[in-house]
Amino acid sequence: MARIAGVDIPKNKRGVIALTYIFGLGKSRAIEILEKAQVSQDKKVQDWNDDEIGAIRDAVSFYKIEGELRSEVSLNIKRLMDIGCYRGIRHRSGLPLRGQRTKNNSRTRKGKRKTVANKKKATK
């Protein structure tokens, strides 16, 4: 099992798919990295030799990935919350940001339903 950028990459998968296990690398960027490192896209990770792994590590080091990318994203969200813009307020209150309706759906953002007492029983 190869270890690139602190992530154990599955050895039985093709190189392109295996590199997508790294946070911040999608399929297109994985293809780009393999081309820079001059490694075949169809080659499985278990067939990579040490020179190829080293070349891939060098190519990956130019990108913001894993912890560095996660911290940047969280700092961006924190900045939005601090300046008090619309998106920041929606982040703070745990609601959808991009104009979706919230009357019926958005259960993922709002969490589990909170039941309200029955109005008929409450008035008696």
Swiss-Prot record:
Q: Name one GO biological process term.
A: translation
Instruction: List, in alphabetical order, the Gene Ontology terms for molecular function in this entry.
Output: rRNA binding; structural constituent of ribosome; tRNA binding
**InterPro entries from the entry?**
Rbsml_uS13_C, Ribosomal_uS13, Ribosomal_uS13-like_H2TH, Ribosomal_uS13_bac-type, Ribosomal_uS13_CS
Q: How does it assemble?
A: Part of the 30S ribosomal subunit. Forms a loose heterodimer with protein S19. Forms two bridges to the 50S subunit in the 70S ribosome.
Q: What is the recorded name of this protein?
A: Small ribosomal subunit protein uS13
Where is coiled-coil annotated? Answer: none
Which HAMAP family is this protein grouped with? Ribosomal_uS13
Phylogenetic classification of the source organism = Bacteria, Pseudomonadati, Bacteroidota, Flavobacteriia, Flavobacteriales
**Compositional bias annotation for Basic residues:** 100-124
Which family does the similarity line name?
A: Belongs to the universal ribosomal protein uS13 family.
NCBIfam families listed in its UniProt record: uS13_bact (TIGR03631)
Q: Name one Pfam family in it.
A: Ribosomal_S13
State the organism named in the record: Flavobacterium johnsoniae (strain ATCC 17061 / DSM 2064 / JCM 8514 / BCRC 14874 / CCUG 350202 / NBRC 14942 / NCIMB 11054 / UW101) (Cytophaga johnsonae)
Question: What does the entry list under GO cellular component?
Answer: cytosol; small ribosomal subunit
Please name the SUPFAM superfamilies in this protein's record. Answer: S13-like H2TH domain (SSF46946)
The answer to keyword RNA-binding applying to this record is yes
Q: What does this protein do?
A: Located at the top of the head of the 30S subunit, it contacts several helices of the 16S rRNA. In the 70S ribosome it contacts the 23S rRNA (bridge B1a) and protein L5 of the 50S subunit (bridge B1b), connecting the 2 subunits; these bridges are implicated in subunit movement. Contacts the tRNAs in the A and P-sites.
Q: Which keywords, in A-to-Z order, does the entry hold?
A: Ribonucleoprotein, Ribosomal protein, RNA-binding, rRNA-binding, tRNA-binding
